[in-house]
């Protein structure tokens, strides 16, 4: 059935009947004549087929637009499949709840770097999104009376932080992402959406500041495909593989943020990288926060539930940045576990076996395979592990990509949209709450579709491509395919990952970051000395990994340079040399009588990061955080204050 679906999706009858012999084939490379170019025209093109990409594609196709989905792997292998814990929505099935409480918790969780109009939109629409998923057939776990089961998750409260722990996270045991991805993909097949599976996106096609399409390579036969479209959605996921230890799949290489960079668009807030508290020690595999939501807790070598000291109210369900830092402090102060005292234990064996089997079957299996642990009898060795990128391509709350200048403020990039982990909407700010990521996918995937449908009629003639469209992409592809330097791709990638792991970790310091920046500059220069060995065009994994390394390098450079420049601690960005959050006001004192600092004198602002791909040079700018909500009558903004759990 899957093979048949794949054939229907990408074996278009005219696929090899088209060819192109214009300027694209005149690039100054040695073997350019080898590259056959196929042209397509669509109303909309979606790059990526995870949760955000599939939800965008469904909305576009349902609205009658001729839609293409370009994905470098089969849709159900997208990294959304690895999400475990759940999706947040204030259904109120376990206790009274209100989306405004969810709004408050998300703003607080972001350490007041989130844009409150986008957070308003996401949390208000969350209940509708979950009901929509249920209608699509997503098999949520149930309570005894048949309602959707909701578990406790970190950083979430009732009554604006005054009413104790909220149970807001809708789940499918501990395999929620797997269920969501299969549900969305299955539902998408009822629409007339064309999938280009195992196609690698090389570059956006830009013309006079507008995005008019995408250049991609078919991994199966090496043909180059130019997708001409008035609308392009980036939904390519994060770049966790820029680090040595992460919960991300090997395919999480920051392709979308790299595409934006090469198109001259600045990415936002790349310095904010979330370390999940509970990756399996030594393997990096994710152990869901839902394990603590179900009653698990962390212990040190003394057997202490140490989170009671760091977050007296929320304890083990404080926000992820707080828990990861607490674990790191315990290890640094000699209270870690194991022979090297370099990790922490997650205890679940006090929970009933029935609860482990029904609510946490996936992590029980994962712990057995990757840690050799029977969770019903012994604790799981865990350590903070790179998990999520809060930064990405900057957008407004409708998914439209923004280009910011101080003179003009936020300006739309015509024809370009982004959703999911590839985007910075910014609903997560400096730190994402657990289970807001799956919500982000469906909310902003849908928002992109709604925005496009407002501005595009089915069958509308797409814009013409510039004469040299794809020329630089093919030139770079050919250069990497015939790279004959002395550094194998895997070797340079490993050096980059270890540099990022060492110099941009849970705790950061100016001298360590500065050293990391210099190391990364040297590694970036080494891209010119790469060596590839496979010269073929058919299933050339050596070539694709090299192109992915180019993308990772862009993301890594932007992350570490922005981190070195941000001289404060906020959310996931914690600096030993600047331990305090630096806002426009001192919120530890009464606001009355205080004068707001200008934007150059505080750090409650979004970074905008431009990079020159040829040299690697990074340029930084900053834009204000949006504090206004969409409708003050629905909910007012949450003023910043000292953040504690």
Swiss-Prot record:
It is a peripheral membrane protein. It comes from the Eukaryota. The keyword Transferase does not apply. It is found in: Mitochondrion inner membrane. Pathway: Carbohydrate metabolism; tricarboxylic acid cycle; fumarate from succinate (eukaryal route): step 1/1. One of its GO terms (biological process) is mitochondrial electron transport, succinate to ubiquinone. Residues 1-25 form a transit peptide. Not expressed in adults (at protein level). Expressed at very low level in adults (at protein level). The modification Tele-8alpha-FAD histidine is found at residue 79. InterPro entries: FAD-dep_OxRdtase_2_FAD-bd (IPR003953), FAD/NAD-bd_sf (IPR036188), FRD_SDH_FAD_BS (IPR003952), Fum_R/Succ_DH_flav-like_C_sf (IPR037099), Fum_Rdtase/Succ_DH_flav-like_C (IPR015939), SdhA/FrdA/AprA (IPR030664), Succ_DH/fumarate_Rdtase_cat_sf (IPR027477), Succ_DH_flav_su_fwd (IPR011281). Its cofactor is FAD. Binds 1 FAD covalently per subunit. Its EC number is 1.3.5.1. Belongs to the FAD-dependent oxidoreductase 2 family. FRD/SDH subfamily. Flavoprotein (Fp) subunit of the mitochondrial electron transport chain complex II which, together with the iron-sulfur protein (Ip) subunit forms the catalytic core of the complex. During the free-living larvae stages, which occur in an aerobic environment, complex II acts as a succinate dehydrogenase by transferring electrons from succinate to ubiquinone. This is Succinate dehydrogenase [ubiquinone] flavoprotein subunit 2, mitochondrial. It comes from Ascaris suum.
């Amino acid at each position: 059935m899957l093979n048949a679906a794949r054939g229907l999706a990408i074996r278009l009858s005219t696929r090899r009947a088209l060819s192109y012999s214009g300027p694209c084939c005149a690039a100054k490379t040695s073997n350019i004549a080898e590259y056959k170019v196929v042209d397509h025209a669509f109303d909309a093109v979606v790059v990526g087929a995870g949760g955000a990409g599939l939800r965008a594609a469904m909305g576009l196709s349902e609205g009658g637009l001729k839609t293409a989905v370009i994905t470098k792997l089969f849709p159900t292998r997208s990294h959304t499949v690895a999400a475990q814990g759940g999706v947040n929505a204030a259904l109120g099935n376990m206790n009274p709840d209100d989306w405004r409480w969810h709004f408050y918790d998300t703003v607080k969780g972001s350490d007041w770097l989130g844009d409150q109009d986008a957070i308003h939109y996401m949390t208000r629409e969350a209940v509708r999104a979950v009901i929509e998923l249920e209608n699509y057939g997503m098999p949520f776990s149930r309570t005894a009376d048949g309602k959707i089961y909701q578990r406790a998750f970190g950083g979430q409260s009732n009554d604006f932080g005054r009413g104790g722990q909220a149970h807001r996270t809708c789940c499918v045991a501990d395999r929620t992402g797997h269920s969501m991805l299969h549900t969305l993909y299955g539902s998408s097949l009822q629409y007339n959406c064309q999938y280009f599976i195992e196609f690698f996106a090389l570059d956006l096609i830009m013309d006079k500041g507008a995005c008019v399409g995408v250049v991609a390579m078919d991994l199966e036969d090496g043909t180059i495909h130019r997708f001409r479209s008035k609308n392009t959605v980036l939904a390519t996921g994060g770049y966790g593989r820029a680090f040595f230890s992460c919960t991300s799949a090997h395919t999480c290489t920051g392709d979308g943020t790299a595409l934006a960079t090469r198109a001259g668009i600045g990415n936002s807030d790349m310095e904010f990288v979330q370390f999940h508290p509970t990756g399996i020690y030594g393997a990096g595999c994710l152990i869901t926060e839902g394990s603590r939501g179900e009653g698990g807790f962390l212990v040190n070598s003394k057997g202490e539930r140490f989170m009671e000291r760091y977050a007296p109210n929320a304890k083990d369900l404080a926000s992820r940045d707080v828990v990861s830092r607490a674990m790191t402090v315990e290890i640094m102060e000699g209270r870690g576990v194991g022979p090297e005292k370099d990790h922490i234990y997650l205890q679940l064996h006090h929970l009933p076996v029935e609860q482990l089997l029904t609510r946490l079957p996936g992590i029980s299996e994962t712990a057995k395979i990757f840690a050799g642990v029977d969770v019903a009898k012994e604790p799981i060795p865990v350590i903070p592990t790179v998990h999520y990128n809060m930064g990405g391509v900057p957008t407004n709350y409708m998914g439209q990509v923004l280009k910011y200048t101080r003179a003009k403020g936020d300006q739309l990039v015509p024809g370009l949209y982004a959703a999911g982990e590839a985007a910075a909407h910014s609903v997560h700010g400096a730190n994402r709450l657990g289970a807001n990521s799956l919500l982000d996918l469906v909310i902003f995937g849908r928002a992109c579709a709604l925005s496009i449908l407002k501005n595009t009629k089915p069958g509308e003639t797409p814009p013409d491509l510039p004469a040299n469209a794809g020329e630089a992409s093919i030139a770079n592809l050919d250069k990497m395919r015939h790279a004959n330097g002395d550094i194998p791709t895997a070797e340079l990638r490993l050096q980059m990952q270890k540099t990022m792991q060492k110099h941009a970790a849970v705790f950061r310091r100016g001298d360590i970051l500065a050293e990391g920046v210099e190391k990364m500059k040297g590694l970036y220069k080494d891209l010119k000395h790469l060596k590839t060995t496979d010269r073929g065009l058919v299933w050339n994994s050596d070539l694709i990994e090299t192109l992915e390394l180019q993308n990772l390098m862009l993301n890594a450079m932007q992350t570490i340079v922005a981190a070195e420049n941000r001289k404060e601690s906020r959310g996931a960005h914690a600096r030993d040399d600047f331990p305090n959050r630096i806002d426009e006001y001192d919120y530890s004192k009464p606001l009355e009588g205080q004068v707001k600092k200008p934007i150059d004198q505080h750090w409650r602002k979004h970074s905008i990061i431009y990079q020159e791909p040829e040299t690697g040079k990074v340029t930084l700018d900053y834009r204000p955080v949006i504090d206004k909500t969409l409708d003050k009558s629905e909910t007012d903004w949450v003023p910043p204050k000292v953040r504690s759990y």
